[in-house]
């Protein structure tokens, strides 16, 4: 059975982690083995009682200073890019990228020849240049966009 490696940048109680929680809960009930990589705290922590879910977390939060927020974002992308290579020799792995933001693990997944699936929640073309760039990257890296 396919192992799902799921990446979500910021685990809080907003819409995208709540939607992801519903999706992952359905997959967990079907018996899929899921590795969840996300920040500490939030709605996704409610899945931790499933034995077939393993969570890897990192500290991430927003700052009032946009430069600090972007530095933190880039650091998480580098961390998750490197972390992703732990699944290099696993067969039957799908990288599930929740939202546009986790571009580091999506890039690593493509480099390793893994299947990359994006769950696209937001309309990037109303959010600004940064999100438009991320949407373009998603279109190049994704095998499938949900």
Please name every model-derived segment:
Residues 7-22, 125:
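A short, glycine/small-residue-rich beta-strand->loop->alpha-helix junction that serves as a flexible
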Residues 6-13, 26-72:
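N-terminal strand-loop element at the rim of the active site
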Residues 8-9, 60, 98-100, 120-123:
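Histidine-centered beta-alpha loop that forms part of the nucleotide-sugar donor binding/catalytic region
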Residues 3, 33-35, 115, 143-144:
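Residues at the starts of beta-strands that form the adenosine-phosphate
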Residues 77-80, 94-112, 127-128:
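An aromatic- and histidine-rich active-site surface loop
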């Amino acid at each position: 059975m396919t192992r799902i490696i799921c990446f979500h940048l910021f685990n809080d109680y907003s819409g995208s982690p709540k939607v992801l929680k519903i999706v992952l809960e359905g997959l967990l009930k079907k018996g899929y083995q899921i590795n969840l990589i996300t920040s500490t705290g939030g709605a996704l922590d409610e899945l931790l009682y499933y034995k077939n879910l393993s969570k890897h977390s990192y500290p991430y939060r927003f700052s009032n200073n946009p430069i600090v927020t972007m530095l933190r974002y880039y650091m998480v992308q580098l961390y998750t890019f490197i972390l992703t290579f732990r699944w290099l020799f696993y067969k039957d792995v799908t990288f599930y990228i929740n939202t546009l933001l986790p571009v580091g693990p999506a890039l690593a997944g493509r480099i390793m020849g893994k299947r990359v699936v994006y769950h696209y929640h937001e309309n990037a073309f109303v959010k600004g240049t940064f999100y438009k760039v991320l949407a373009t990257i998603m279109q190049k890296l994704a095998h499938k966009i949900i």
